Regions:
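Conserved, mostly hydrophobic/aromatic
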Residues: 2, 40, 48, 81, ...
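Glycine-rich, proline-tolerant flexible connector loops at the mouths of alpha/beta enzymes
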Residues: 44-66, 105-112
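Short catalytic helix/loop segments, enriched in acidic residues and glycine
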Residues: 14-38
Length: 168
């Protein structure tokens, strides 16, 4: 359940722009995020995710967050949440009903993997409630982890060694 500018959307990956709150849209739903959370719940689908696509600095962030919180209330324990998650706010989402928090940009800050930030997230929510998003884009024949709404490449190539290191 991707939420952008307070609406559930399917967007073209990598098209999000922080300036102007713009994205290329494939589809914009008329229903709320809570409606879709209810569908997940009625079909007994667990492990789906909610992604807040607006940064905290966006004028639409509060609308987007409100949609996310309503969805979590609709299906407590059934959905994960990501988008701007930090050790400081992760607990709020878990208390609201998220089963897990999803992080990328916080751990891969400025294109670099920061193990101390990963440890802080783990201390805040425990491994049991933490999902590390390893979304990638291909560059120069390798797949690099990307952050910040798929706009920024990290210096981390996704391979067996990377997965082994991060899972330990």
């Amino acid at each position: 359940i991707d939420i952008h500018n307070g609406k559930v959307k399917q967007i073209v990956g990598g098209s999000l722009m922080d300036t102007g709150n713009r994205a290329t849209e494939n589809f914009v739903a008329q229903q709320t995020a809570a409606y879709f959370a209810g569908l997940y719940q009625s079909k007994k689908l667990v492990g789906g995710h909610i992604i807040l696509l607006n940064p905290v600095s966006s004028e639409f962030y509060e609308q987007t967050k409100h949609q996310a919180m309503e969805a979590l209330k609709t299906y407590p324990g059934g959905l994960q949440i990501g988008g701007g998650i930090t050790p400081e706010n992760a607990g709020e989402y878990l208390e609201a009903g998220a089963s897990h928090v999803i992080v990328t940009s916080y751990v891969f800050k400025d294109g670099v993997l920061h193990y101390e930030r990963l440890r802080k997230m783990e201390q805040a929510v425990s491994k049991k409630h933490l999902v590390l998003d390893l979304s990638c884009r291909k560059r120069d024949g390798s797949y690099y982890i990307v952050t910040d709404r798929w706009q920024k490449y990290t210096d981390v190539v996704l391979n067996e060694q990377t997965i082994a290191e991060l899972s330990s």
